[in-house]
Amino acid sequence: MGLDRRDPNPESRSTRLVLEQLAVMSSASTPVRIGLSGALGRMGHAIAGALDGRDEAKLVLALDRPGTEGRPFGALKLGVAADIARCDVAIDFSTAEASARLADIATERGAPALVIGSTGWTDAEDAQLRAAAAHVAIVRSGNFSLGVNVLAGLVEAAARRLAAADWDIEVFEAHHRRKVDAPSGTALMLGEAAARGRGAALADVEVRARDGITGPRPEGAIGFSVLRGGGIVGEHEVVFAAEEEVLTLKHSARDRGLFARGAVAAALWVAGRPPGLYDMMDVLGFRS
């Protein structure tokens, strides 16, 4: 029997292809200078690894929480947020509060463009980021995976075609025990996609908690169910349940490297873009 030469991780291969296409499209004669905020976290290390050895992008600045300045990070020492103006793009996976502050600093200095993967945004922090997007280009996404963004498109299409009177929508998500916000940014992104498909605002139809005697499920509700435990990288399911059949759309993440590669692809894409708030649907060309 011959060897099976199929890629065991086709999504990883697809993400690499997208990143390579973006690199070819780049007309820059010098590497895109990348700053990394949240460098000491799991995603920070994964992104640094994804940048290592790339010709079209170079890590020139690494940041983390106050008090870490001067600590070694690979060939660099951790710097301060005020230095981000010397970067072309800053990739930030920290907290929503820190991301909003970083956006303010970028606005004050007129640079750099931002790629933000932080989740758990308050309304005030979201407004702060949107105001900054009037001055700098920002890509924000609850998930930088190619597969999840395809899933969001499928969820929106299904919600548009499956009537709320007959089909209930529930978003399930599971993550490792160290994740501090719930529902996940990805779950909310999928909920937003479902709500768009039904022509509704998620805030008007979401149900995030159930306890005790809750009564019948409201028609058109989009529910969220959350699990935290162990080292789960990320599991997301969107269930469309009718009386006689159930449709389940699911994505499983096996390695943080796929998110890191997606973030690098977003950084290459957003470098030199006009101010505005973008997401991975823009980066991947899914939105005309």
List PLM regions with ranges.
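Intrinsic-disorder-associated, low-complexity terminal segments enriched in Asp/Asn/His/Tyr and depleted
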Residues: 4-9
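Arg/Gly-rich low-complexity intrinsically disordered repeat tracts
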Residues: 11-13
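C-terminal substrate-binding/catalytic lobe of Rossmann-fold NAD(P)-dependent oxidoreductases
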Residues: 33-84, 166-288
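Short, ordered loop/turn segments at secondary-structure junctions
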Residues: 65, 119-121, 143-144, 174-176
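N-terminal Rossmann-like NAD(P) cofactor-binding module of classical short-chain dehydrogenase/reductase
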Residues: 90-91, 115
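Short glycine-/small-residue-rich Rossmann-like dinucleotide-binding loops
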Residues: 94-95, 119, 228
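ADP-ribose/adenylate-binding Rossmann-like module
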Residues: 105-124
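Rossmann-fold NAD(P)-binding glycine/threonine-rich loop
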Residues: 118-138
